[in-house]
């Protein structure tokens, strides 16, 4: 009995010791650990990461230097202007041509929380229309993106938006990237960007 108890305690301690913790991937000071792709504006102001359309009104991305396969990402965002943004995952980039999948961040009525495949199949899944109420446009929102194997789940302000199983996503690899859509007129603030590798 004592041996079983000892082994049980040892197993629990090992799990606790090796369990991954969420870590911040934005230090609130500069863009260390990230790479700017394109000519659009990415800068830090008062501890917040800001993306803003530049004079070229083109696509722009801020990608992590590290690649992430299976993870649970949380962040906060606030939209200060009309326009489309998003969080790419398991992605690769050539200039400003990005391949991979995007968890949508957009104005009301534009599928925030949905999953879009860039240069591929397009929209894979959109949230049900009534879930649009969970987005607080012009205010701080909490976004959660969990990617494990071939499954993707998104939440906005604690509400599940979509759950998707997709074989192609399961085979994907690459970095995480924040997006500025082309067309101009975009400004989004981001903060508290944390990731737990799974």
Give the predicted meaning of each segment:
Residues 1-21:
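Bacterial Sec-dependent N-terminal signal peptides
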Residues 20-198:
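Carbohydrate-interacting regions of secretory-pathway proteins
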